[in-house]
Amino acid sequence: MSTHSITGKTVLIAGGAKNLGGMIARDLAAHGAKTVVIHYHSPTSEADAKATLQAVRRTGAEAFAFQADLTQPGAVATLFEKTLQAAGSLDIAINTVGKVLKKPIADTTDEDYDAMFAINTKVAFQFIREAGKHLSNNGKLLSIVTSLLGAYTPFYSTYAGAKAAVEHFTRAASKELGGRGISVNAIGPGPMDTPFFYGQEEPEAVAYHKSAAALSPFSHTGLTEVEDIVPHVRFMVSDGWWMTGQTILVNGGYTTK
């Protein structure tokens, strides 16, 4: 088994029940992962988690799911403990969780700010910290951020600002974990064609993005397709091992950096 192949590896995906996380779980299992552990936030996602577990198991891989609100004290550490208890080891850790808010700075409350930084910054930091403790040597650690890190746009100050911290966490962790052969990176998708994006947008904004293909000659809708992100994730946690400390914007040229 190659050190950097997905074959035979154990994977943990936070936010792995549906949307991008669920598709990553299915894809890595199809490409040879031995065990896939998915996390989901609340009981409302339990049906999605079960569907993803079934899809993963159909590939021949083992699959486990754990529900947790990762913003609660100790929840991220507990997730890693449960993963190791279930799978025995951990080779690849991927954090896809996040929360988006579209609101002018003047209208953003302290509660809004705290909620955004709790999930997008604090949980992301804790995930990197715990992954660093528990990943096997030559492991892979990947965070999902946002292409807004390369955008000049209003209204997403707390979302993009909270995700911006993860870019530095990624650089720092790559230096600290590099001696063990662990690569640490982040991927920033463009606005994706999922409820995560649409839930924050007014109909006019959705229509604009759907007609904005001219902004990216590779896009048919102006939005990033989830299917287009998954191969980049797979690459970063396998053959892309020589890349580390990087935040890669994957959006068909929607924004650049």
In which residue ranges do the predicted regions lie?
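Canonical Rossmann dinucleotide-binding motif of NAD(H)/NADP(H)-dependent dehydrogenases/reductases
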Residues: 3-37
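Conserved glycine-rich Rossmann-like NAD(P)H-binding loop of the short-chain dehydrogenase/reductase
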Residues: 33-49
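Substrate-binding pocket helix/loop in short-chain dehydrogenase/reductase
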Residues: 104-105, 112-117, 209-214
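Catalytic loop of short-chain dehydrogenase/reductase
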Residues: 140-165, 170-179, 191-192
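Short, small/polar-rich loop/turn modules that mediate ligand/substrate recognition or access, typified
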Residues: 178, 183, 243-245
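Catalytic Tyr-x(3-8)-Lys segment
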Residues: 179, 204-228
